[in-house]
Amino acid sequence: MPTVRLATHHELPQVGANLAAAFADDPVWNHLSPGTARWDKRAPGWFTADATARHVGIGEVLVDDQLRGAALWAAPGHWRPTLRETARVALPSLRLFGVGTVTAMRTLSAVEKRHPRDPEHWYLAILGTHPAHQGHGVGSALITAITDRCDEQGLASYLESSKEANVPFYERHGFVVQETFRLGDGPPMWTMWRDPKA
């Protein structure tokens, strides 16, 4: 299994590029973003800004030893973005979503409203592996780095999946679907919860 560690600050642009590539075919992100050319140009900057603003120093930005994938984990009690964190991704959001920025922000806010408040838990905000490296255990390593810790500390973990094909992958790691929902005319999403293993 790949070795997992915290990303360094200078690696965050590569984290952003890998996550943008990983989510390029994601139904929800495709629904929110206005076209492939804009995605390829703007999404790496958005993911880099999100990782920097919301997870460095607050949660954990985990990468594998060869920088093939990344997981953005929010620590217990820090899953909701602060006003400052939101402001730090405002310009990258405008660049990525363009005229659809307000709709995208409403959609992300509606997803946030489904987030459980209790009990205390780690939140897997984003997990992605560059498509050229998927299927080699990178995603599993990035998940178990935190879920193993959750098991040791008696903490739960939570995520939202925006792709149905990924639901069985998360289930293999102990996550259980809580709800399937649609946001307006968008594609379905799944909320998933994992209780700690004894």
Predicted regions and their residues:
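A short beta-loop-alpha structural element at the N-terminal edge
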Residues: 3-17, 21
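A short helix-loop-beta-strand connector motif used in the catalytic cores of GNAT acetyltransferases and
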Residues: 42-62, 119-123
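Conserved beta-hairpin
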Residues: 55-71, 130
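Conserved acyl-donor/pantetheine-binding loop and adjacent beta-alpha core of acyl/acetyltransferases
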Residues: 70-128, 134, 183-185
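Conserved GNAT acetyl-CoA-binding A-motif
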Residues: 120-122, 149-162
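Conserved beta-strand-loop-alpha-helix junction that forms the acyl-donor binding cleft
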Residues: 125-134, 158-167, 185-187, 194-196
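Conserved acetyl-CoA-binding loop-helix of GNAT-fold acetyltransferases
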Residues: 135-148, 172
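Conserved active-site alpha-helix within GNAT-family acetyltransferase domains
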Residues: 140, 152-154, 163-180, 184
